[in-house]
Amino acid sequence: MEVYIPSFRHEDSDLERGYTVFKIEVLMNGRKHFVEKRYSEFHALHKKLKKCIKTPEIPSKHVRNWVPKVLEQRRQGLETYLQAVILENEELPKLFLDFLNVRHLPSLPKAESCGSFDETESEESSKLSHQPVLLFLGDPYVLPAASDFPNVVIEGVLHGIFFSHLQPR
């Protein structure tokens, strides 16, 4: 799993003063998705993670400082924090995966120490779904044959499909 925070933006709200939203890019198993979180959500995650695993330091919250340089330092610090949690823990807690909107892997022992799958999800929803994958290493019709003998079956089928208007050899 790879995690980056490529950007942030300022949100204005009628009910409260504005806040900053950090855009988190999550790359896992060849798939990429984005999650947006406020600093307060990072801080809440940190408090919960400290009870389950050894955590790195989280960047401090500056007193309503909207200076772009300070926000950029916080973005870098939060990115480093997420990457350190991943690097320092062989198995990631369920609440960390929830934070990143990553589908749970049912065989993570440390995940259960932070909350069991049975508490929040049914057995059906926590199962991994099967995603068939097709892999073509190369086109067998373009690559040279492994032996010097022609494959008469393949030649016959290809001739019949693509050259049916021609007479046989």
Curated annotation (Swiss-Prot):
The identity of this protein, by name, is Sorting nexin-24
Domain writeup: The PX domain mediates specific binding to membranes enriched in phosphatidylinositol 3-phosphate (PtdIns(P3)).
Question: What PROSITE patterns has UniProt attached to this entry?
Answer: PX (PS50195)
Which is a Pfam family this sequence falls into?
PX
- PTM-bearing positions, type N-acetylmethionine: 1
Which residues does the UniProt record annotate as the domain PX? 1-125
PANTHER family, per database record: SORTING NEXIN-22 AND 24, SORTING NEXIN-24
**Tagged with keyword Acetylation:** yes
User: What is the stated purpose of this protein?
Assistant: May be involved in several stages of intracellular trafficking.
The annotated topology with respect to the bilayer is: Peripheral membrane protein
One GO biological process term is: protein transport
Q: Which residues carry this modification: Phosphoserine?
A: 113, 116
Major place of residence: membrane
| Entry's Gene Ontology molecular function annotations | phosphatidylinositol phosphate binding; phosphatidylinositol-3-phosphate binding; phosphatidylinositol-4-phosphate binding; phosphatidylinositol-5-phosphate binding
Please provide one cellular component term from the Gene Ontology annotations of this protein: cytoplasmic vesicle membrane
Q: Which UniProt keywords apply?
A: Acetylation, Cytoplasmic vesicle, Lipid-binding, Membrane, Phosphoprotein, Protein transport, Transport
For this protein, the record's InterPro entries field holds: PX_dom, PX_dom_sf, Sorting_nexin_PX-domain
- Give the binding site residues for a 1,2-diacyl-sn-glycero-3-phospho-(1D-myo-inositol-3-phosphate): 38, 40, 61, 74
